[in-house]
Amino acid sequence: MGLDIYAGTLTRYYSHNWKTVVQQWAEENGYSFNRITPDGEPADDEELSPTDVQAAVENWRDQILAAISQPDQPPYAPWPENNEKPYYTDKPDWDAFGAMLLVAACRTYEEPVPPTVEKDWIFGEHPLIARLASDEERVWSLFRGATWWLPLTDSFLFQGPLPTDDTVAIATLGGLRKELERLNQLAWQADEDTILGWADTEGYPVDGTVDSDGQYSKADIPEHTQYDTQSLAKFAFSMFWRAMRFAEEQQVPILLDY
C-alpha cells in the first residue's frame, strides 16, 4: 500500500477529480490502472455529484472551523472549496516518509543518522522515532500521526472527524511549515531551490526500465533491499515542501492518501 501526498480542495479529492502520479504515468504510457483501498478492495466509483460533495465538504469545513476558533478571537476564515482549483500530488511512499522522520529524530537527539534503511521497514518502531513521537516537549504533527493539514497560519494539532466520519489527527499548514523549516535547519540548511529539486534528483534507486515498446523490465537490475537514508529523506522532504508551498499559495488543505 503506497503513500501519496495531495494538496488541493477536498471537493476535488472526494469527487475523485484528481489522479495520482502513478495514474498519470499509466495513462501517458497506455497502461490500465486500478486503485486499491487499504482493505484490499478496488476503489469504489459510486460517488455523489461534485455539487453534493462540495456542499458536504463546506458544511464539514464550517463546523470544524467553528469548533477550533478561539474565544475572544476572530473566527477562522473558510478556505475556498470547488471542483476546479488546481491540485498538487506526488508519491513519497512509506519508506521515504519514514526516512524523513528518522533524520528528524536523529538530528533532534544528536544521534548519528543510519546510512541505510531496509525496504518496507517499520519505521514507527525505531527507538528514536518512537521517542520523538511521545516527547511532550517537542510536538511534531508529522510524528503524532497527522494525515491532514488545514490552510491556517496558527499552529495546533487535534483529533477530529473527517467528512467521512473517520477520526484522525488534523494539523495546520502553519504548523507544518515550522516543522519543515526546523527539520531543514537541523539536517541540511538547504536553500529553497535545492529543496525543491530533491524530488527530481534524490529518492529510490531504479528497479526496472521501460523499453521502446513500453514494456517494463527488471532484467539485469538487482532488486534493492536497502535504501540510502539521506536520499530518501530529502526526496520525501522535497515533496512535503512542494505541497506546503502549493497549499499556501492556493489556500487548500494537504492530506496523505493511502
PLM regions with names:
Residues 248-253:
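Short helix-adjacent coil turns
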Residues 1-242, 246, 258:
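Acidic (Asp/Glu-rich) sequence patches and key acidic residues
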